[in-house]
Amino acid sequence: MLQTQNLQFSYKGSKPLTFPDMHCGKGEQWLLLGQSGSGKTTLLHLLGGLLTPQYGSLKIGDTDITQLKTAALDKFRGQHIGIIFQTPHFVKALTVEENLILAQQLAGVKIDKALVFNILNQLNISHKLKSKPNELSVGEQQRVAIARALINNPSVILADEPTSALDDKNTDEVIQLLENQAAEVGATLLIVTHDGRLKNYFKNQIEIL
């Protein structure tokens, strides 16, 4: 489902970052572990189509996303890749419901308010449907970010440091939530983190040195 080969990326004035080849099957759950400065967030941005590698291939299903032009890549990302950023970003003027509908619109899929409600309900956050993002707690914002990542039934879910600021109890809850929701839609889950506690949760692991 998610395959990379010979990926390489460099920021201007910096030496190239090279990444290990990956092969993550459909529905598998993976941990990508690396310390700060290892390039793990850069890799997440490459996997999500937010950066373009200077070299290498990156396939989701049968599509090499490095070959897609901007508009096609944006549409493909919206329909097939769910990204949960370390710090959630929402359109502040819109409600929770409207932010999720916007994700549907940007992906070019049919607006489905019932689906929006159902996903929020699964995450125990449907009572905040009409709330603005700044009216939510940090934990509630994280759940809405997960809902937004799931709204278009993605093939791949990428989560950036979802537990870095959490205690053990909340870490366990968030990981179970991500695993359960990924399994619900049959998506490949890849968690990118420096949090060594997560080694105990995943049998499939990649470490970036």
Label for each model-derived stretch:
Residues 12, 101-113, 122:
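ABC-type ATPase nucleotide-binding domains, specifically the catalytic core motifs of the NBD
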Residues 94-101:
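Short coil-to-helix segment of the ABC ATPase nucleotide-binding domain corresponding to the Q-loop/switch region
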Residues 78, 131-134, 152, 185:
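Conserved signature/switch motifs of ABC ATPase nucleotide-binding domains
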Residues 157-160:
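Catalytic Walker B motif of ABC-type/P-loop ATPase nucleotide-binding domains
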Residues 48:
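Helix-to-loop junction immediately C-terminal to a conserved catalytic motif
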Residues 132-136, 140-142:
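Conserved ABC ATPase signature
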Residues 56-64:
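Conserved ABC transporter NBD signature motif
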